[in-house]
């Protein structure tokens, strides 16, 4: 065995072995328990970042651990390859998105291999290939046939510069998140999938996601947002028009003093024709964002429409206002306003001089609305026949009366909206719908699938090439001329079912049900919590669609979910001559001074600029504080980077990147190498004889098996990888002090090192693969099996008992492990150090905590 640990040689050699032997390629084996481990696949942006490395290291640790447990482990990888960044890069680099994407895939694939991740590369998929998206198109046509797909005109956030629809989350301060252009509201026809048809099931089944973090489950419950309320109809005075509103507080309906409608509501637009002030307000609202976060923070504004609505219960006339806090695409586009009992309505009413009418008061007192609305539930007053009722009583009585008079009904509403899947971009899967000459809209026939996206295109940065190329849209269906849909799918479509395609990636059908049902559901899914309400909800929805199409037989896609924390790094900048911040990479920084707690006080860059240190923040391009994984792997080795990633923080918390910590991980691997090298110079010649071990050897073996038990639990049930590493490090301290004098010393060291390299193998697989062989074991470590805990080794011959007198420690006793209370009591009372405090006084009570503590109460 070579004396020096040279990571580059070891890692290259081991990676070649894995590739040559197809170590991680798997097939279905009904005789073995399966385990499907999946990390969210990457977007091929060009280079891996440390966030990727953390995500994929966690996945690889889980997969390798489960393999050593004897399971048939599937760990696939692929590329979420469609999306806007490829278009922007293509425009910038005067190329097409496809070659840019495929080059990035090649580069990042080599980076993943360099890190030693145990993927089944035979199952690799890229979502931008027709072999993948043809089945997505096929499935969409089947959903259309089932009535789960429809097209409607919908108000969207429109970026006039990018010529695309933006999600609410992509509108920041009323501007496009990419180009800062003010966003407009625009009505365009779009395709939708009826996720609302599954809202109840998606909500109820959250209770079955036992292996998912509570935070994700709560976020999904809130996003789906089930509420029970009443829908009621308000008629417009002197008109045949009417509109519906929905409320979860029908108990307050007698306090309605005005009604607010969206600026885009048909009634507002109609009234605006003869009202210049209202027309200007409607236009202003079209420019503002529609995210709930923006609605919560923006100034509440409105304009009177001049219309009056008739209260459905009192017959009173209430004014109708157009307001910027009501959305046309949420609920009915109209809300009843009860300023006495809703703070937003209260502030709006105060601003515009509208009436307040209190109708709810505390059960034990009067109501005061002089400073703020009273928003609690209470008892009704000022409410005619409903006076004296509490919330539940009023809810039922008012709902019943509205229903009896044909003016309303009870209703369950969901915050969740149907999924708009149309995107006005080029680099996405074409939506497989056509419009015939006679105006009929229908799915692309199955024999014409896939609808292939042309890859040899020129990006002008203005219009999608498939929208600009009028010839591309022309086709024939059933002998008629037809035009293809030129919108493409939201890229969340591809990531909603990729996990299932991995089960049979080359099948000439969407899924091979036998293979899919062998592997699914995913046993362990790993990815960021930022995906809680979008991807992770669509992922669950798609699984239910696949189930209802007879393609899978489970209800949920993943049993267990781990959401890893972000990776943070130090961030530094200086101000240039124009006063602009220039962010400097931590790799180019020299820390000149720290305080006594290790905090950075002074730092300079390579050019001598004195830097401002802003603390730890998420690695990002904007702050130039990303650390290139490749640089670290070349310097320290993949095993070191992986070990640091797993040791530095619990997986779900943020990880602070510290190169000093990476150096520490590297030193630990070198210590392990040195110990194995010393042992292999004079290895064991005898088998371990447990019955012949002396006290020190028994103690060391007990530490070994305690560590095996802890690491097994930490890597499996608890998923606390950092404490698993800490336990092995502690064991290593014992092993380094252990003698190698006798035959049994060496036999015990052989058992210990053979266990340690398997315990660390999931985390640092290259060095452990190598050491397994150097220790004289035959076969690859992947087939070695996980070390078993010898329960008998954990049994202690003796126990250390702390002896207290009146609560103060006076002695420590070593007693036989099976000593009785009476024996321990007698030994404790006989101790000289104890008798000093008990002689001449009365022992009142003796309390014994078995195996731990003896407390003598004396006075």
Curated annotation (Swiss-Prot):
Kindly give the PANTHER family that the UniProt entry links to this protein.
LEUCINE--TRNA LIGASE, MITOCHONDRIAL, LEUCYL-TRNA SYNTHETASE
Cite a single GO BP annotation.
leucyl-tRNA aminoacylation
The UniProt entry annotates the motif 'KMSKS' region at 618-622
Query: What PROSITE patterns does UniProt report for this protein, alphabetically?
Result: AA_TRNA_LIGASE_I (PS00178)
Q: Which Gene3D superfamilies match?
A: 2.20.28.290, 3.10.20.590, HUPs (3.40.50.620), Isoleucyl-tRNA Synthetase, Domain 1 (1.10.730.10)
Which SUPFAM superfamilies does the annotation name?
Anticodon-binding domain of a subclass of class I aminoacyl-tRNA synthetases, Nucleotidylyl transferase, ValRS/IleRS/LeuRS editing domain
In the record, the note on similarity to other proteins reads: Belongs to the class-I aminoacyl-tRNA synthetase family.
Organismal lineage: Bacteria, Pseudomonadati, Pseudomonadota, Gammaproteobacteria, Alteromonadales
> Matching NCBIfam families, A to Z?
leuS_bact
Check the record and name the InterPro entries matching this protein: aa-tRNA-synth_I_CS, aa-tRNA-synth_Ia, Leu-tRNA-ligase, Leu_tRNA-synth_edit, M/V/L/I-tRNA-synth_anticd-bd, Methionyl/Leucyl_tRNA_Synth, Rossmann-like_a/b/a_fold, tRNAsynth_Ia_anticodon-bd
* Gene this protein is translated from: leuS
Ordered alphabetically, the record's keywords are:
Aminoacyl-tRNA synthetase, ATP-binding, Cytoplasm, Ligase, Nucleotide-binding, Protein biosynthesis
Give the organism, scientific name: Shewanella amazonensis (strain ATCC BAA-1098 / SB2B)
Q: Which GO terms describe its molecular function?
A: aminoacyl-tRNA deacylase activity; ATP binding; leucine-tRNA ligase activity
Q: Write down a Pfam family by its short name.
A: Anticodon_1
Give the motif span ('HIGH' region): 42-52
The protein's name in its UniProt record? Leucine--tRNA ligase
Q: Where in the cell is it found?
A: Cytoplasm
